[in-house]
Regions:
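Nuclease catalytic cores that cleave nucleic-acid phosphodiester bonds
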Residues: 2-168
Length: 168
């Protein structure tokens, strides 16, 4: 059975993910460190809370062993997205962008280059402020993922959720 895992550390769409998953009777696991207040979700049917010790990537390393092919992961973390894709999960950002295995290596390379640049004293731009359009896009893409089910199994490729190239 598909499960929706939410990297709930500062996730702006936790409630949306729970509502969409519950509407399809899909269980949800919220994973966050102890500094996040997840008590508001305690006791909700179909919602499990996994709180981990504070620490860099501790939520990621607690989540990955629990992932199964076909699960859906909600995260804005490219590293966690790569690990989830390697376990044949579908991965969506809180802004509604699906991470794809075909390009995750390039995204990791960009992330690494930006980290090196910052360590050397350089500056990089952060993400733009979260907008209502981001939330709507997230809802649409997650709803599509849950409606279509997930594709699992060796060599399976999930259906694309991006529009692909535009024809003129």
């Amino acid at each position: 059975m598909t499960t929706v895992f939410v990297d709930a550390d500062a996730c702006p769409v936790t409630r949306d993910a729970i509502a969409l998953a519950r509407s399809r009777s899909v269980p949800v696991v919220l994973v966050a460190n102890h500094s996040q207040n997840l008590a508001q979700y305690a006791g909700r049917s179909g919602v499990e809370i996994l709180q981990v010790a504070s620490g860099r990537d501790s939520a990621d390393f607690a989540m990955v062993p629990r992932l199964s092919p076909g699960d859906v992961v909600v995260t804005g973390d490219t590293g966690l997205a790569a690990m989830a894709l390697s376990r044949r999960c579908r991965v969506i950002s809180p802004r509604g962008r699906e991470y794809l295995a075909a390009v995750i290596d390039a995204e990791l390379a960009v992330r690494h280059a930006e980290q090196r640049h910052r360590r050397a004293g350089g500056r990089t731009t952060g993400p733009s402020p979260f907008q209502p359009e981001d939330r709507e896009r997230f809802r649409e893409v997650l709803a599509r993922m849950l409606a279509a089910g997930t594709v699992a199994g060796p060599g399976a490729t999930p259906p694309r959720t991006d529009p692909g190239p535009l024809n003129s």
